[in-house]
Amino acid sequence: MIIDLQLNQGSAPWSQLRDAGIAAEEAGFGSLWNLDHFSGEMFGADSMLECFTSITAWAAATSSIGLGTLVTNVMNREPGLLANIVSSVQQISGNRFTLGIGAGAAPNTAFSAEQDALAISLLPRMADRHDRLAEVVGTLQSIWSADRDASFVGFPRPHIAPPIVVGVNSFALARRAGALTDGVNTRFNHPDRGALLAAAIEASGHRAGFDASVWSWFVPEYADPTHPFHQELAAEGVTRLIMFERGAPDVDAIASVAQYLN
């Protein structure tokens, strides 16, 4: 099982976040992930560095660790703009990027306050949000395709298309993501965690390299293959554990995970 780290880029000054990313690379984490939020309010922070700006800065500060977003809300950016941004990040990072995407929330809810404040249009029906996610995936793939439409000549295109992973909380989206993308991610305490992942894997046709990942809170011991939680995930077919450090990153704690990774 690959062990990754996710940081909250609203939790600390950039210098501390940069050092945490470097520490994660030195410790042997597979990838470093961040959030796609415009405001730090949800995390009790007074600010939030923008998702792709900070991931690009980590790309410049590191050389080998994978990089990813968990997850990019597909309502936050027009698909063509997202394709351009991701192509740029993939080039700058040396093909280390994975695009994690999510369908987002309904309008006028606690989870949509940022988008409501910025007058970003949202879709009330979950089925429509799932359709939007599938549409975005299709647009990305068409812009990145070797035989893309002539209207996209001159638009940046990654030499290696980044994997696309979908954050899922429902069986409908798990199955759809399994068929359309390169992986899924769900939360560690989802009551249907194992079944969601199994549904996505089945929908993928048990495709080689399909990424079935789970995020949890940052607990260094979870990286230990002998830890009961680690073994529980492995038994469910989890290929990647992404540990999320919600608060200001503790560089020493991050470094301590090296004992389980090397």
Regions found by a protein language model. Give the residues of each.
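Active-site-adjacent structural elements that line small-molecule/cofactor binding pockets in enzymes
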Residues: 1-262
